[in-house]
Structures are given as structure tokens and as C-alpha cells.
């Protein structure tokens, strides 16, 4: 049976992604000086204005306006004619401390207060919020990500590359990509549709943009065997995309959570990542759930795996762990869930310890996806638990 699935990505110059990158640049700058800081940093951008707000508790000082401007400059908004300029935009900051009501639950977990867990056993941190998080992996690509989002990200990164390297100098920072993949019996067989929208300078013709994007962006990214004469390609389908970035649309941190994860191919708990320190389970537990799912697929126990984990604020142990292999598991989902509980410690402090998350590693994943990154060595992308999983699988 044939079916289609579509995922989208955006470039680093998209207004929402500008915000994600500034939020994570602030987080990284603080974690570099104070690894135990509490950070919840949100950003909004609009024409000529950046607003940085949130709750930050730290012993260090960072120059937030400078971090914001440097990030905008790196993205490529360096001239007013691009609709946004790192040097002339206004930067307003409004920062408070973390609520003491939240801090009391995170500083010392409920289990530690009740004496169930010694301080020596693990630094006892309760979850920073309630909620449920999902992790996913499948064997469609070498990085164990779904193919539609994998290709959409590669196209978006390629757009930025040809712009920054001067291959297509008329391109500007804002842009979006979208890929529709056709599946036969649950395996990707061809690319049905590609959509690329890219901001550009006013003097270039639509015909030139179309020809150049096909030649320098689409062909180098989409595997040759996946494109055919019936593949539909849409490039700047409105015909013009000169006004873009924060001048075209306002942006907010955390509005691209599907782009950040699996492109809609797997479920999402609703929590965003950027600007949050690792005591926030929205971020750390979602990374851990990806780590679990990826190791299960890498071990060969399933072709597809989705892991759900849930928490209560101030409580360290997960309330629930659920595994769904969509009928692809070599053993039952319940048995795999048992293996997960034995192999992985999903208490927030253990996640932070095992994945070494109190480091400035976040800005690099704030654009082009937090998962399946071939260009980065991310701890939650490692498949170093396969041996333990297979050993436990013999005992269940």
C-alpha cells in the first residue's frame, strides 16, 4: 500500500528560529560560567525589535543585548535592506528570578525529602515541571530519523550554506523547506514533492531562483534515486519573497517544536526546548526519550520505536514509561519497557549526569533539528546502550 507523509523545516533566518537561537545562545553563555544556573529564556522579535524575557537565577553576569546582536549577525541579518539589522535593532530585556515555589521542588526532590534517596546516590533533583515527553527513532535513514524531516532539514541547511558561501549571493536569511515522501509497505520509495521558499534580493528573477535552487540546493541533497519525472517541485510558489525575517513576520521562541523534533511523524508532548536549562524536563527528558528510542532501534529490537515518559513537578522518578514499536518489535512492547527501566535511569538528575547536559551545547541545535544531526556529536544521539539492551533482552 502506498501513502504520503510530509514534513517541513525552516532556515536559521526564520523569525521563530532567530528567537530559538538567541534563547539558547543566552543559555549557553550562562552555563559556560555557571553550570548550575536556572534558565528559562524567551525571545520575541518583530520589525526592528528584540525582546528577551524570562526567569534566570545565576551567580554570573552575561551581556544579553550583545549575545542577541551577535546571534543575529551570525545568522546574516547585517543590513537594514534585509529587513533586520543586528547593529541597529533595539534589544529590550526583562529578566526575573525563578519562582521560589518551583525552586523548592527542583532543588531537592520529594524522594530526597522523604529519605527514600540518599544525597550520595545521585544529586537529587525533582522534575522542574509536570508533563509528558516523547522520543522516537526508526530505521528509514542512517541517523534513525524519519526521512521527510531528515531531507527537509538537509535542504534548509543547504539553503543557508549556499547563501553564506556566496554560491547564491542574492539569497537572504529567511526560508522554509518541505518534503513529501511516498511510502510503500512502510518503506520510503520516492520523493513526491519538494517545496522551497527562500528570501531573496529584489533584482533577481523568479526563473533564476528556480533554476539555481534546483541545481545548487535540491539536487545535491535529495538522493538521485528518490527523484523522478513525476516529482513535483515548488520554489517560491508566490513568485516573490523579498520581505522576510522579523519584518515579514514576528517570531517567538518555542513555535517550531515539530521542526525541532520529528516533523510530525511521531507524537509530541507539547513542550519546547530552547532557552531552558536541563532541569526542565521538557528538554532533558525529551532528549533522554530520543536516546532510549534510538538505542532500541539500533539494537535491532524494533524498526520503529516511540517512548513516552511522564513527570510530576518536584518528583524525581518518572510517573510512567511507555514503549510503542508499532508492530515492528521482535519482543513485546511491555518487555521492551521493562528493559528500558533496567538500562536507563530517567530521573532528571540522572539524565543530566548521564548525558552531561550542564554544558553550553544548545545553540548549535537551535536550528536544523535537535535529533539526527550528522554534523554534531550529541550525547543523546549515541548508540552506546545497545550491548546492555541486548543483554537484558535475553533475560526478559
UniProtKB/Swiss-Prot annotation:
PROSITE patterns: ADOMET_SYNTHASE_1, ADOMET_SYNTHASE_2. ATP binds at residues 14, 174-176, 240-241, 249, 255-256, 272, 276. Mg(2+) binds at residue 16. Residues 98-108 are annotated as: Flexible loop. It comes from the Bacteria. Pathway: Amino-acid biosynthesis; S-adenosyl-L-methionine biosynthesis; S-adenosyl-L-methionine from L-methionine: step 1/1. K(+) binds at residue 42. SUPFAM superfamilies: S-adenosylmethionine synthetase. GO terms for cellular component: cytoplasm. It is found in: Cytoplasm. Binds 2 divalent ions per subunit. GO terms for biological process: one-carbon metabolic process; S-adenosylmethionine biosynthetic process. The keyword Zinc-finger does not apply. L-methionine binds at residues 55, 98, 249, 280. The keyword Cell membrane does not apply. InterPro entries: ADOMET_SYNTHASE_CS (IPR022631), S-AdoMet_synt_C (IPR022630), S-AdoMet_synt_central (IPR022629), S-AdoMet_synt_N (IPR022628), S-AdoMet_synthetase (IPR002133), S-AdoMet_synthetase_sfam (IPR022636). Its EC number is 2.5.1.6. Belongs to the AdoMet synthase family. This is S-adenosylmethionine synthase. It comes from Caldicellulosiruptor bescii (strain ATCC BAA-1888 / DSM 6725 / KCTC 15123 / Z-1320).
Amino acid at each position: 500500500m502506498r501513502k504520503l507523509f510530509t514534513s517541513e523545516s525552516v532556515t536559521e533566518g526564520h523569525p521563530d528560529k532567530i528567537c530559538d537561537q538567541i534563547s539558547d545562545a543566552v543559555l549557553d553563555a550562562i552555563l559556560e560560567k555557571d553550570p548550575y544556573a536556572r534558565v528559562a529564556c524567551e525571545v520575541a522579535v518583530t520589525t526592528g525589535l528584540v525582546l528577551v524575557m524570562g526567569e534566570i537565577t545565576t551567580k554570573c553576569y552575561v551581556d544579553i543585548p550583545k549575545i542577541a546582536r551577535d546571534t543575529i549577525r551570525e545568522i546574516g541579518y547585517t543590513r537594514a535592506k534585509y529587513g533586520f539589522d543586528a547593529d541597529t535593532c533595539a534589544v529590550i530585556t526583562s529578566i526575573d528570578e525563578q519562582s521560589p515555589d518551583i525552586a523548592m521542588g527542583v532543588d531537592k526532590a520529594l524522594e530526597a525529602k522523604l529519605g527514600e534517596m540518599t544525597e550520595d546516590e545521585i544529586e537529587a533533583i525533582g522534575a522542574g515541571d509536570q508533563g509528558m515527553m516523547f522520543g522516537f527513532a526508526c530505521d528509514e535513514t542512517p541517523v534513525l530519523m524519519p526521512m521527510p524531516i531528515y531531507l527537509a532539514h538537509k535542504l534548509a541547511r543547504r539553503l543557508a550554506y549556499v547563501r553564506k558561501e556566496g554560491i547564491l549571493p542574492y539569497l537572504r536569511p529567511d526560508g522554509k523547506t518541505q518534503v513529501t515522501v511516498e511510502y510503500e509497505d512502510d518503506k520510503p520509495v520516492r520523493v513526491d514533492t519538494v517545496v522551497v521558499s527562500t528570501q531573496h534580493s529584489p533584482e533577481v528573477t523568479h526563473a533564476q531562483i528556480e533554476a539555481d535552487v534546483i541545481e545548487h540546493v535540491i539536487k545535491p541533497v535529495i538522493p538521485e534515486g528518490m527523484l523522478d519525472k513525476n516529482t513535483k517541485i515548488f520554489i517560491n510558489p508566490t513568485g516573490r519573497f523579498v520581505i522576510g525575517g522579523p519584518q515579514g513576520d514576528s517570531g517567538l521562541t518555542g513555535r517550531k517544536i515539530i521542526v525541532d523534533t520529528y516533523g510530525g511523524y511521531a507524537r509530541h508532548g507539547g513542550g519546547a526546548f530552547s532557552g531552558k536549562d536541563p532541569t526542565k524536563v521538557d528538554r532533558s527528558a525529551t532528549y533522554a526519550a530520543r536516546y532510549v528510542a534510538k538505542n532500541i532501534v539500533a539494537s535491532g529490537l524494533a524498526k520503529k520505536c516511540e517512548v513516552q515518559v511522564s513527570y510530576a513537578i518536584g518528583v524525581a522518578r518518572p510517573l510512567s514509561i511507555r514503549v510503542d514499536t508499532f508492530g515492528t518489535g521482535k519482543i513485546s512492547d511491555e518487555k521492551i519497557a521493562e528493559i528500558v527501566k533496567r538500562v536507563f535511569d530517567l530521573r532528571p538528575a540522572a539524565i543530566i549526569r548521564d548525558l552531561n547536559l550542564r554544558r553550553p551545547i544548545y545553540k548549535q541545535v537551535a536550528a536544523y533539528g535537535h535529533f539526527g544531526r550528522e554534523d554534531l556529536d550529541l550525547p543523546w544521539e549515541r548508540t552506546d546502550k545497545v550491548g546492555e539492551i541486548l543483554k537484558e533482552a535475553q533475560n526478559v
